[in-house]
C-alpha cells in the first residue's frame, strides 16, 4: 500500500472495476532522452486492457486479490507490450503472465517505485512487466507520474567501480 507496483492482467477491467481494486492506475505514455537521462512518463487511465502492464497503487495491502465478473483474453497472452519512442530512444514495457528471465543488454526490472537495471538471470514474476530500451544506455532512468518525478535509480555502467569522495556527518 502507498507504493507504485507493476501489474499485467489477463483480462480487461472497466473503470468501475479499476476503482474497486486500485487507488490509482497509470500507463506508459511517452519516453524522452534528456542528456544522459532517460525519462519515462506515465499518466492516468480509466480502463485496464488485458495484456498491458500498468503501474498501480492499492489503498491497502492484501495477500490475495479476487477479481469478479472478468473474462480471460487468450489473445492477450501474445501481445502485452506498450511501445513509445522519441526518435532517439524506444521504450518497450513488456507484460508477462508467467515467470520470465528477459535477455538483453538494456533490460530493467521494476521494484516498488523504481526501474533498475536487471542483472543477468533476473527473474520477473508472473503478472508483472519489465522494460527494454533501444537506442541508448542511460546513466539514469527517471520515472515521472503525472509530471512529477518519483524514485531515481542510478544505472550501473562504466563508472560503477570509480573512486568517489564519501562524507559522514560525525
Over which residues does each language-model region extend?
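Intrinsic disorder/low-complexity signal
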Residues: 36, 72-74, 85, 145, ...
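Short linear interaction motifs
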Residues: 34-42
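A short, polar beta-strand/turn micro-motif
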Residues: 1-21, 41-151
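C-terminal outer-membrane/trafficking sorting elements
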Residues: 23-32, 149-170
Amino acid at each position: 500500500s502507498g507504493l507504485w507496483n507493476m501489474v499485467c492482467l489477463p483480462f480487461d477491467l472497466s473503470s468501475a472495476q479499476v476503482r474497486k481494486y486500485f487507488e490509482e492506475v497509470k500507463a506508459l505514455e511517452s519516453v524522452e532522452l534528456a542528456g544522459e537521462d532517460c525519462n519515462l512518463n506515465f499518466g492516468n487511465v480509466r480502463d485496464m486492457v488485458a495484456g498491458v502492464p500498468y503501474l498501480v497503487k492499492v489503498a491497502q495491502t492484501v495477500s490475495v486479490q479476487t477479481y469478479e465478473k472478468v473474462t480471460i483474453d487468450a489473445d492477450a497472452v501474445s501481445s502485452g507490450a506498450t511501445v513509445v519512442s522519441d526518435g532517439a530512444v524506444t521504450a518497450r514495457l513488456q507484460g508477462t503472465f508467467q515467470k520470465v528471465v528477459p535477455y538483453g543488454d538494456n533490460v530493467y526490472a521494476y521494484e516498488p517505485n523504481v526501474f533498475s537495471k536487471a542483472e543477468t538471470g533476473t527473474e520477473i514474476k508472473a503478472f508483472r512487466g519489465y522494460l527494454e530500451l533501444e537506442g541508448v544506455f542511460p546513466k539514469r532512468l527517471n520515472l515521472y507520474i503525472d509530471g512529477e518525478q518519483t524514485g531515481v535509480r542510478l544505472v550501473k555502467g562504466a563508472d560503477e567501480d570509480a573512486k568517489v569522495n564519501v562524507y559522514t556527518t560525525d
